[in-house]
Each structure stands twice: as C-alpha cells, then as structure tokens.
Amino acid sequence: MAQTDILLTKEPAPQTVPACQLPRKLYDVARNTGAHTSSGLATSGFRTAKYLLDEWFQNCYARYHQAFADRDQSERQRHESQQLAAETEALAQRTQQDSTRKVGERLQDMHGWKSELQRQVEELVSETELLLAQKQRLERALDATAGPFSIVTDNLQCRERRQHPDLVRDCVEIELLKEAELIRNIQELLKRTIKQAVSQIRLNWEHKETCEMDWSDKVEAYNIDEACCRYNNQSTDVQFYPHSAKFEESASTPETWAKFTQEHLYRAERERLASVNLRNLIDCILQDTSEDLRLQCDAVNLAFGRRCEELEDARHKLEHHLRKTLREISDQEHNIAALKQAIKDKEAPLKVAQTRLYQRSHRPNVELCRDAAQFRLASEVEELNLSLAALKEKLLEAEQSLRNLEDTRMSLEKDIAIKTNSLFIDRHKCMAHRAHYPTVLQLAGYQ
C-alpha cells in the first residue's frame, strides 16, 4: 500500500477485491431448535443471543472488506487531490506568469506612448516659446512703425505751411502719401499677424495641455501597472477583491485606447507644424515690411533731396534776377533824374525864345515884320516844345518802367522768401525729422 506523502504519477494497480461500494446484506439466522439449544425448553421456538461462527466470520470479512474499500477510496481521492493541486498550482503559475508578461507588454506600450506624448509636449513647449518670441518681434515691429507714421504725418503737416505758389503736389508729397499708405497697410498686416499668432499660441497650449493630461493618465496607469507587475505570491499588500474581475462598461478597448492617443499626437503635431509655418511666415513678413519701409524712406529722402536742389536753384535764379532788377531800378532812377534835369534844362531856352517872341510882338507899325529872326524864334519855340513833350513822354515811360521794376522787385523778394520758407520746411524741418527714422533691425522687431 502506498505512503500518503508520495505523489502518484499513474493509476494504482487493481486490487484483489474490486474497489467498489458493497451493498449491505441482511442475513437471516435460523432458529436453533436442535438438541444443542442453550435455552432449554423454556426458549423452545426462539433464537438465542449468540451468533453462529459463520456469522462471525462473515462479519469479520465484511469489516475487512469495508476497511479496505474505504482506504482504497481515500487513497484514490488523495491521489486525485494531489494531482489536482499540482495541476492547479502549475496552471496558477502559468496564468500568473502570462498575466505578468501581458502587464509587462502593456507597460512597454504605455512607456512608448508616454515617451511620444512627452516628446510632443516638449516640442510644443519649445515651438510655442519660439512663436512667443516671434509675436514679441511683431509687437516691437508694430511699435517701431509708430515713429515713421509720426514722421510722415508731421512732414505732410509741415509742408501744408508752404506758401503759394510753392504749395504744390510735387514728387515729395506723392512719395510721402505713398509712405503713409504703406505704413498703414503694414500696421494692419502686423495686427492681423499678431492676432493669428495669439490664436496659434492658444491652440498650442490647448493641445499641450491635452497631451499633458493624456501623459498624466498614462503615468498614473503606468505606475499602477508597474506596481501590479511587482506583485507575487509573497506580497503582503494583496487581498481579496471578489468583484474586481468584472469589466467596466466605460472601459476602452486597445484599439480605441491607441487611437485616442494617436489623435492627440496627430492634432498636436498638426498644430506644431502650423506654428512652424506661421513662424516662417512671420520672418518673411517682418523682412519684407522692414525692407519696404526702408526703400520707401529712401525714395522720400531722395525726393526731398531733389526738391531741395530745385528750390535752391530757383532761389539762386530769383536772387540773380533780383540783383539785376535792383541794378536796373537804380539805373532807371538815374535815368528819370536825368530826364527831369533835361526837362528842367529846356525851360530856360524856352523862356528865352518865348520872351524874345513876346518882346518882338511889341514892335511898332511896319517894324512888326515876319523876318527870318521871327521865323527862327517860332521854330525854336516849336522845337523846344517838341523836345519837352518827348522828354516828358519818356519820363512817363521811365517812371512806369520804374514802377514795373519795383513790382518785379517785390515779387522777386516775395518769391525768394517763399522759396526760403519752403527750403526751411523741407530741409530743416522735414529732413531733420526724418533723420530719426528707425533702422532696419528696429523695423524687423529685433530691437
């Protein structure tokens, strides 16, 4: 018979007596009515209290058989129990190892997604910081345009103080109006770009927070699974949770779990690329706007330079004509004085001639003769009158010419003053103010 502490690996050999439950059998004992009765005549017809020898043997055999059957059944049950315990132990070990392996694989998957989320968050943070720097460049560039706009507005207002006929729509004013329109357009463009950058920064932060929340959930789940992976049969912090094997209705599937994170990564990467494209666009915008402003500034300065040269040349010519006019006025004044003196000089000869004629008109009788002297005196008076008339007419012409020269002098002096005022406005007001125009680096938002 096998020992109880030995594990049987095969079925036991069949015994002599089959291992089955034997039915109990009732034996009818015959009444002892023979001569060997022990009860005498008083017990005639009744069984005695003693068993027969056969009954005794049969009873012993029945006890032997029952003991053997019970032992055999117990041994078989022990063998089956030991085998079942070994099988369940092996199964438990296999399932636990498989569960641990599955949890480990899950840890690897979560670590991979967690790393991707962390990388995406870091890239989004880095990209958002770069975009914030570009936004600050836009704001500095927008602030830098306030100076040029103030300059061009002041130039236009200053040039409105020019006097006629210099108050003209010249090339300088055309370039200034172009510059003012360009600055307004650039300011509107920069404002729109700043709004776009602010919106993109907000989207970047939103997707960063979404990835951070997903990353945080995965870190928490990773820590839970990592703790679960360390559990073993010797752990002291394990206990029974009868209802833990029930699946939650809100639980996700591996496909939806992976798709959930993939969507977050895809959207975050899409916004990151949009942010990169926006940064490149901002670079191009700032470079183009700063170059356009400087080119237009140079065009305005060139127009101012040409206009100042034109005004300077016109003033020099006016001053030259003024000098000639002044000389001519002086000469004309001397001429008028000479004419007046000539007229005055003709008065004495005319008086003499007229006095002679007058005195000779008092000659008596026949002496009042139209002699040659009389004719010569008459012609002398006529000649003197003609000379005086010519001199007076020439004097009137000279005086009118002098008045015209004076008017011309006044006009020239006024024009020279106007040109001087225009030069002062353009050169000392406008161009001096334009010397404070921002640099390209300031217009590009670097300073």
From Swiss-Prot:
Expressed in trachea multiciliated cells. Ubiquitinated, leading to its degradation. Deubiquitinated by USP16, promoting its stability. Its main location: cytoplasm. Residues 82-97 have a biased composition (Low complexity). Residues 72-104 are annotated as: Disordered. It is found in: Cytoplasm, Cytoskeleton, Cilium axoneme; Cytoplasm, Cytoskeleton, Flagellum axoneme. Pfam families: Tektin (PF03148). Keywords: Cell projection, Cilium, Cilium biogenesis/degradation, Coiled coil, Cytoplasm, Cytoskeleton, Flagellum, Ubl conjugation. GO terms for cellular component: axonemal A tubule inner sheath; axonemal microtubule; microtubule cytoskeleton; sperm flagellum; sperm midpiece; sperm principal piece. Signal peptide: none annotated. Residues 69-144, 304-423 form a coiled coil. InterPro entries: Tektin-like, Tektins. Belongs to the tektin family. This is Tektin-4. It comes from Bos taurus. The lineage of its organism: Eukaryota, Metazoa, Chordata, Craniata, Vertebrata.
